């Protein structure tokens, strides 16, 4: 009994140290698609223009310019289809939930062939590899699919994202909406 308690105490101490480091450094267990630790102090950079959107160094909603540029591509793709800020936020929310606004060149649990901002699969529905890796084209493909869904305007943002992405968890995208709205508002003004 005494030995079991010692082992339990050692394991609990190790877990506490790991969780503490995760909280202090903003990495690890709880940071899969959260803003990077470096986003709290973005590197100085000149504004970049994506279409008509001027992207500052950041941070906006905890994200720096490298990821905000991708959000601007999502917004520009939506605008090219006549889609307003509310639905632009759905696209940004989805990209946050899928990749943390990064163009990922590797798969995820849903599929080893998933790529890009939206982790789109190589099943022919999302275009070529190059299309899936291009923030603007992959965003166009996302919004084209969204507007083809009957009644999409009546769906909540999370339901709309889920209808396109068919994530295992239909509520997966909901926590990303406030940051997406903040990004769209800041970049849209």
Where are these regions (language model features)?
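C-terminal region of N-terminal signal peptides and the immediate post-cleavage residues
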Residues: 20-43
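A general structural signal for well-ordered secondary-structure junctions
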Residues: 30, 84, 100-101, 152, ...
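Soluble periplasmic/extracytoplasmic beta-strand elements of cell-envelope proteins
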Residues: 91-93, 117-121, 163-165
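Peptidoglycan-targeting cell-wall enzymes and recognition modules
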Residues: 36-39, 43-62, 99-157
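N-terminal export and membrane-targeting signals
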Residues: 1-16
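Soluble non-cytosolic domains of exported or imported proteins
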Residues: 61-69, 81-89, 129-137, 154-158, ...
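Export/targeting segments at the very N-terminus of extracytoplasmic proteins
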Residues: 41-96, 100, 187
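Catalytic and binding regions of secreted/periplasmic enzymes and modules that target cell-wall glycans
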Residues: 132-133, 137-189
């Amino acid at each position: 009994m005494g030995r079991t308690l010692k082992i339990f105490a050692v394991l609990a101490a190790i877990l506490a140290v790991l969780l503490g480091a995760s909280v202090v450094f903003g990495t690890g267990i709880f940071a899969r698609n959260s803003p990077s630790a470096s986003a709290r102090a973005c590197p100085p950079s000149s504004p970049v223009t994506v279409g008509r959107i001027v992207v500052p160094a950041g941070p906006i909603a905890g994200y720096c310019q490298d990821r905000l540029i991708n959000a601007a591509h999502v917004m520009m793709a939506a605008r090219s289809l006549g889609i307003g800020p509310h639905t632009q936020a759905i696209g940004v929310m989805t990209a946050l939930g899928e990749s943390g606004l990064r163009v990922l060149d590797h798969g995820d649990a849903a599929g080893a062939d998933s790529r890009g901002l939206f982790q789109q699969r190589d099943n022919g529905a999302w275009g070529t590899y190059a299309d899936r890796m291009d923030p603007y084209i992959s965003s166009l493909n996302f919004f084209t699919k969204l507007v083809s869904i009957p009644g999409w305007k009546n769906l909540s943002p999370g339901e709309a994202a889920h209808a396109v992405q068919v994530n295992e968890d239909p509520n997966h995208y909901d926590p990303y909406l406030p940051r997406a709205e903040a990004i769209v508002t800041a970049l849209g003004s």
